From Swiss-Prot:
It catalyses: Hydrolysis of proteins to small peptides in the presence of ATP and magnesium. alpha-casein is the usual test substrate. In the absence of ATP, only oligopeptides shorter than five residues are hydrolyzed (such as succinyl-Leu-Tyr-|-NHMec, and Leu-Tyr-Leu-|-Tyr-Trp, in which cleavage of the -Tyr-|-Leu- and -Tyr-|-Trp bonds also occurs). This is ATP-dependent Clp protease proteolytic subunit. Belongs to the peptidase S14 family. One of its GO terms (molecular function) is ATPase binding. Its EC number is 3.4.21.92. It is found in: Cytoplasm. Fourteen ClpP subunits assemble into 2 heptameric rings which stack back to back to give a disk-like structure with a central cavity, resembling the structure of eukaryotic proteasomes. Cleaves peptides in various proteins in a process that requires ATP hydrolysis. Has a chymotrypsin-like activity. Plays a major role in the degradation of misfolded proteins. Its main location: cytoplasm. It comes from Legionella pneumophila (strain Lens). It is an enzyme of class 3 (hydrolase).
């Protein structure tokens, strides 16, 4: 989609492969991410922030408009980032009609771990050497004592909301999620599956349900 490849190019220091396709009207070139978008694959790469979240949301809505019945695959390699940006993606994933299948490649930490576990039931995956990390939201504010108190209450409210969301998708209680996220909690792919963040560790494409003609 317009603007998406520009963001990827910036993050990859200008290095991005191009794909050349033969059509009845001659050759057509795509950047690799736009080509994969045609296969209903979205990449969530790098820090979760407002600009990236807007691009992911736009792609989810576009693919729903293209075919509201066909699954969308969300590939995640992210250290996390801004909570509100992550929740914008989360709400859109839950809002649209197609199932969103999630796959962790590399890492899914913090807000990215929340998005990983928010995939459709039975369609949440990790590759075997991926790492997943969950923790409580980070907060830091300077200012008058009253303002600090206001932001502290907001941070606690956000934490409760995130705990409830993760509890819903992992089938655990919010209290257990709160205990398990007191500090950075790192997991292997297998541990993430046992915890309920994902449904399966993928060792082979044939069982992934992510196969394409590429």
């Amino acid at each position: 989609m317009p603007g998406y490849s520009d963001n990827i190019i910036r993050n990859a220091s200008g290095l991005i492969p191009m794909v050349i396709e033969q059509t009845s009207r001659g050759e057509r070139s795509y950047d690799i991410y736009s080509r994969l978008l045609k296969e209903r694959i979205i990449f969530l790469l790098g820090e979760v922030e407002d600009h990236m979240a807007n691009l992911v949301v736009a792609q989810l809505l576009f693919l729903e408009s293209e075919n509201p019945e066909k699954d969308i695959s969300l590939y995640i390699n992210s250290p996390g980032g801004v909570v509100t940006a992550g929740l914008a993606i989360y709400d859109t994933m839950q809002f649209i009609k197609p199932d969103v299948s999630t796959l962790c490649i590399g890492q899914a930490a913090s807000a990215a771990a929340l998005l990983l576990c928010a995939g459709a039931d039975g369609k949440r995956f990790c590759l075997p050497n991926s790492r997943v990390m969950i923790h409580q939201p980070l907060g830091g504010y300077r200012g008058q004592a009253t303002d600090i108190e206001i932001h502290a209450r907001e941070t606690l409210a956000v934490r409760e909301r995130l705990n409830n969301i993760m509890a819903k998708h992992t089938k655990k209680t919010p209290d257990q999620i709160m205990r398990d996220t007191e500090r950075d909690n790192f997991m292997s792919a297998t541990q993430a599956m046992e915890y309920g963040l994902i449904d399966k560790v993928l060792y082979d494409r044939q069982i992934a349900g992510h196969s394409t003609d590429l």
